[in-house]
Amino acid sequence: MNKKDKKFNYIFGSEIVNDVKKRLPYYKSDWIDACHYRVLPACLNIYFSNLLPELAFALDMFAKTNNSFGVNEVLLASVLGSVVFALLSSQPLCIVGVTGPITVFNYTVYDIMHDRGTPYFPFLCWICLWSMIFHFIIAIANGVYFVKHITKFSCEIFGLYVAFIYLEKGVQVLCDQLKYGLTNTFLSITIALLFLMVGWLCDTVGKSSLFSYKVRILLLDYGLVASIIFFSGFQHIGKMREVSLAKLPTTKAFEPTLSRSWFIKFWKIPVGDVFLAIPFSIVLTILFYFDHNVSSVMAQDPSFPLTKPAGFHWDFFLLGITTGVSGILGIPAPNGLIPQAPMHTAALCVKRVDYDEDEIEKTHKEVIDRVVEQRASNFIQGLMTVGTMTGPLLLVLHQIPQCVLAGLFWVMGFSAIFGNGITQNVIWMLSDRKVVSKNHTLNHCSSKRVVWLYTILQLIGFGATFAITQVDKASIGFPIIILLLIPFRTYCMPKWFLEEDLEILDENVGIIAYQKV
């Protein structure tokens, strides 16, 4: 076992200092290395990959917090995370923005506190300020060390949970269209389904062997954006123009959705509510501890040949700062984005295509030569998001029908489901053994029953997490279930599985990434 696996540093703040010392010598090259052709497509790819889900999340929070949050708040949160982490973080490849889980957290807090008559934004600000303190304590006490216990077991459960949240949000958006009449609802469902089919087709063809490599990459990078543009205008064809579809609500440029200041007067709240915010802040800290660190781990996946060191402790300390600032500004707290973080690294990969010819067929395989590790792409997409808050672009965003965002939720959800390890395990278990490759990884397990048991445990974990989200006001506790999965995997599962089987089924992604630090 590597020495790093055994040693926990008991000197407060030492790991933060080590993170900064290791990354600082590369700071100049982080900007010089940005002079590469892969940076521009990475900027555009991540800008749209970040923007489109955030518009959907903005619509969700707008509806469920009585217009407290809107497009500008979500965009500003994305700018805060992108710019701060691009300039100061140890791992600038990790994309930071507004996630699905934080939207669930924010509107659940609203539901709980609204009934008590507690002012929402001051209370949310105190949640963020307390969470900032807890982030500092964890980072200074070298507590991010325990990210080494995060494995694919809990990551895949969380990924499946987020995917089903996307699907649920899409359905909820369409259900909301019922208040505009049956004709409006029917057209909305039709457009959402068409968007799903076209978006799914772009993704499938982009990952296939059809057409040339450049065409496939073009479909993967910009197919979803083109679909949104097309279906935003689709409603104006023929008699469909007679149906007035509900649009994405926007506000004035650089102004909050509600008539308020960007600075939250957090002192205008009863003292009791200040301390009542502590348990909520603990839950938020737990969510960010898992969500952000998993995002960072996935951005540094072993499949990416990264050469520059990262730093978990300094980045978590930095996340505490952005969490506190977001509370003061009255915006959703940004953190690591699980789909976008590895997508960003993948977009910066310099690849070559190797062809393997045999007597029967010709196959091709993409090989990653290196990754363009730099800060500019994250920083530039943050500046592009600032531009999105201007009046003309907000007017453009206002033209997007809500049903298109519902279709976007579905595309993200189904893509995440079919790319999830749990789904792949289920497909393997249900497949005909005669047509499954003999070299398939799961064939090396001691028995098929082992794969069944492992997958069933994952589905139970997913079911518990998703079920608590469906319970009003109790849904705020879903990060606790996610956290409990880590000790369950570490201490309980080794008693039920052979070590050799766990090595095949459950890669320890946390320790692999942490060893690079």
From Swiss-Prot:
MF annotations from Gene Ontology: active borate transmembrane transporter activity; borate efflux transmembrane transporter activity; solute:inorganic anion antiporter activity
Annotated TM spans: 68-88, 93-113, 121-141, 155-175, 186-206, 217-237, 269-289, 311-331, 377-397, 403-423, 449-471
UniProt keyword list: Membrane, Transmembrane, Transmembrane helix, Vacuole
Keyword Transmembrane belongs to the record: yes
InterPro entries recorded: HCO3_transpt-like_TM_dom, HCO3_transpt_euk
Principal cellular location given in the protein's record: membrane
One Gene Ontology term, aspect cellular component: plasma membrane
Single GO BP term: monoatomic anion transport
Compartments, record wording: Vacuole membrane
Topological type in the membrane: Multi-pass membrane protein
Keyword Disulfide bond carried by entry: no
One Pfam family matching this protein: HCO3_cotransp
Protein family per UniProt: Belongs to the anion exchanger (TC 2.A.31) family.
Name of the protein in question: Putative transporter C543.05c
